[in-house]
């Protein structure tokens, strides 16, 4: 299983890719798509092109993205929503299902507390994946999203397995 995590942003969109083998997590790649274009349509296309390049290069089998949280500034929420929508659409065009997680769920899965600081997320991502240095914030967030997805999908698989066992016992 190869998981692509996306941390959408209107200026910087982070991506992180992990591979799972024998229930162990391995770092594959991470980085930032830095938006340099001007004009909304060109900026959104740059996000789509960057994600398409990542998908074509690393061939993820699953993807996950951070949900939008409430902003005080409606303009910022709109821009983030546009970036997130383009990211999700690009993943769907590339035949990837997209799972969504809140910032609190991601922090809980990686750090153990939903109120963790960004520096704590960076530190735990570095530790979990055995990296020699902390990844940049946006890349660390994207890797954390991928890690969260792995833990969530593993839990759901256990629940589904337990449900099948319970149904067999009932019959």
Curated annotation (Swiss-Prot):
CDD domains xref list: RuvC
Catalytic function, reaction form: Endonucleolytic cleavage at a junction such as a reciprocal single-stranded crossover between two homologous DNA duplexes (Holliday junction)
UniProt entry tagged with the keyword DNA damage: yes
Cofactor binding note: Binds 2 Mg(2+) ion per subunit.
Entry's EC annotation: 3.1.21.10
SUPFAM superfamilies given in the database record: Ribonuclease H-like (SSF53098)
Swiss-Prot/TrEMBL keywords: Cytoplasm, DNA damage, DNA recombination, DNA repair, DNA-binding, Endonuclease, Hydrolase, Magnesium, Metal-binding, Nuclease
Cellular localization per UniProt: Cytoplasm
GO process terms (BP): DNA recombination; DNA repair
Annotated residues for binding of Mg(2+) 2: 66
Listed transmembrane segments: none
Active site residues according to the UniProt entry: 7, 66, 138
Binding site for Mg(2+) 1: 7, 138
Entry keyword Membrane: no
Summary of the function given for this chain in its UniProt record: The RuvA-RuvB-RuvC complex processes Holliday junction (HJ) DNA during genetic recombination and DNA repair. Endonuclease that resolves HJ intermediates. Cleaves cruciform DNA by making single-stranded nicks across the HJ at symmetrical positions within the homologous arms, yielding a 5'-phosphate and a 3'-hydroxyl group; requires a central core of homology in the junction. The consensus cleavage sequence is 5'-(A/T)TT(C/G)-3'. Cleavage occurs on the 3'-side of the TT dinucleotide at the point of strand exchange.
Subunit note: Homodimer which binds Holliday junction (HJ) DNA. The HJ becomes 2-fold symmetrical on binding to RuvC with unstacked arms; it has a different conformation from HJ DNA in complex with RuvA. In the full resolvosome a probable DNA-RuvA(4)-RuvB(12)-RuvC(2) complex forms which resolves the HJ.
Family: Belongs to the RuvC family.
NCBIfam families hit by this protein: PRK00039.2-1 (NF000711), ruvC (TIGR00228)
Protein name: Crossover junction endodeoxyribonuclease RuvC
Taxonomic source organism: Francisella philomiragia subsp. philomiragia (strain ATCC 25017 / CCUG 19701 / FSC 153 / O#319-036)
Lineage, uppermost ranks: Bacteria, Pseudomonadati, Pseudomonadota, Gammaproteobacteria, Thiotrichales
